[in-house]
Design a protein with these regions (language model features):
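Conserved ATP-binding/catalytic motifs of P-loop helicase motor domains
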Residues: 1-168
Length: 168
């Protein structure tokens, strides 16, 4: 959508890149509401760049060039992706966030999980503090042959190198 790839370069370099891409330019000029999902994975640096790009391309000094913005995500889940061991700053710590976001909402009702015990385990995991009972429930699942299940599990890895190995 944005036409900036990984967002490397200065705001001006990215603006120049977008101006050469008719489709991306149309996105920036015709969008009234910009929705960014999984905002927890975006760095403060990239969010600030998007804000600057919006202002320049739309010739409007309001946040994001006057677009409304809706950020969706859970900062307890996935942090920004770190490159080369560099720790990055969360999007909510950016200048763009301070400038643009005036209201935060928290959704508190779990819609996709009906198992109350599993909900409790997920809440503990989200907060980084599993009880002994939750650990026992999880450990009881160890050794089960997940390949027998008709629903294949999502595989999660803590390191990019492990993800790259699986994706090869």
């Amino acid at each position: 959508w944005a036409g900036i790839g990984l967002g490397k370069g200065t705001v001006q370099e990215l603006v120049t890149k977008i101006r050469r891409n008719r489709k991306a330019m149309q996105h920036w000029l015709c969008t009234d509401l910009l929705v960014i999902d999984e905002i927890s994975m975006m760095t403060a640096e990239l969010l600030d760049k998007l804000n600057g790009i919006g202002k320049k391309l739309r010739a409007n000094q309001q946040p994001f060039g006057g677009m409304q913005v809706l950020f969706v995500g859970d900062f307890y889940q996935l942090p920004p992706v770190y490159k080369n061991g560099e720790q990055t700053v969360f999007a909510f710590e950016s200048a763009a966030w301070a400038e643009a976001i005036h209201e935060n909402m928290e959704l508190t009702i779990i819609q996709r999980q009906k198992d109350v015990v599993f909900q409790a385990i997920l809440k503990e995991a989200r907060l980084g503090s599993l009880s002994k009972q939750s650990c026992e429930i999880i450990h009881a699942r160890e050794g089960l042959d997940w390949k027998q299940n008709k629903i294949l599990p999502t595989l999660l890895f803590p390191r990019r190198s492990e993800v790259d190995m699986i994706n090869e």
